[in-house]
């Protein structure tokens, strides 16, 4: 938990919903959190201020016209659906909870538009109860830091409940939302990260190791439409958006969502980097190599090439820091794998 402690000392900023929650009004926290889904921070802040000038409590929400409500929360993402859910929410709160927001996770989860993230945020921010709010930022960063190894935010929440000391439960969401939006985003800005974090971050260690491999073997990045007619070794960076069970050869295994680095080469008499990599890029190809089966579901995002004959040497460098898919793409050599994994 050393990385969390470092961030607590380094960051002095609140996420928007945390700011809204300062007056401990459960109604405002609940409504703002629902609005914040799939919505940028600055939009959530603007919409919440505009909305709470007209909507002070459940009765106001119950009495407002749905179309007017939708106009008030525009341009929040899915504003029409959110307006519909907020109207349903107001009715249920009035009829079942005397117009009050319930203070338990179980009751909050019964409300329309309320998932585990929202429910946990309400009980922690509005009622000061123990909960762990896991959104995409918390899920992504806890996986990158190898605190958990999970596929979904819900899985991350349950793992954190087992592993995370309770003193961090209430603060981890605000901490990692701010850090995730500004630095450790889906396209990480490692160059902007704190030196103390980089020294201990397992994700940064892998990113740096990959950069060192590129330098060591003189790789250069090329675009898909400018692959040269040259001999050489290549690395494909492939993105798999969702976890998938994939069969290659006689083997079937689950491939986690994230990034895969595949190492290949083109040194045959009639083979060069251009025709080899362009074959990988085709959708309508005969399934032959292991990589063909992964590319049926994954997308090539980056291509790196070198004119050096270093396929196995590169694989042996990757294996020092990266997880690998055993026996993938290496049937004609002694390498353990030519496919390596990086969490998203």
Swiss-Prot record:
Its cofactor is [4Fe-4S] cluster. Belongs to the Nth/MutY family. DNA repair enzyme that has both DNA N-glycosylase activity and AP-lyase activity. The DNA N-glycosylase activity releases various damaged pyrimidines from DNA by cleaving the N-glycosidic bond, leaving an AP (apurinic/apyrimidinic) site. The AP-lyase activity cleaves the phosphodiester bond 3' to the AP site by a beta-elimination, leaving a 3'-terminal unsaturated sugar and a product with a terminal 5'-phosphate. Residues 105-124 form the HhH domain. Keywords: 4Fe-4S, DNA damage, DNA repair, DNA-binding, Glycosidase, Hydrolase, Iron, Iron-sulfur, Lyase, Metal-binding. It catalyses: 2'-deoxyribonucleotide-(2'-deoxyribose 5'-phosphate)-2'-deoxyribonucleotide-DNA = a 3'-end 2'-deoxyribonucleotide-(2,3-dehydro-2,3-deoxyribose 5'-phosphate)-DNA + a 5'-end 5'-phospho-2'-deoxyribonucleoside-DNA + H(+). Its EC number is 4.2.99.18. [4Fe-4S] cluster binds at residues 184, 190, 193, 201. Pfam families: DUF123, HHH, HhH-GPD. One of its GO terms (biological process) is nucleotide-excision repair. This is Endonuclease III. GO terms for molecular function: 4 iron, 4 sulfur cluster binding; class I DNA-(apurinic or apyrimidinic site) endonuclease activity; DNA binding; DNA-(apurinic or apyrimidinic site) endonuclease activity; metal ion binding; oxidized pyrimidine nucleobase lesion DNA N-glycosylase activity. It comes from the Archaea. The keyword Translocase does not apply. It is an enzyme of class 4 (lyase). Binds 1 [4Fe-4S] cluster. It comes from Methanocaldococcus jannaschii (strain ATCC 43067 / DSM 2661 / JAL-1 / JCM 10045 / NBRC 100440).
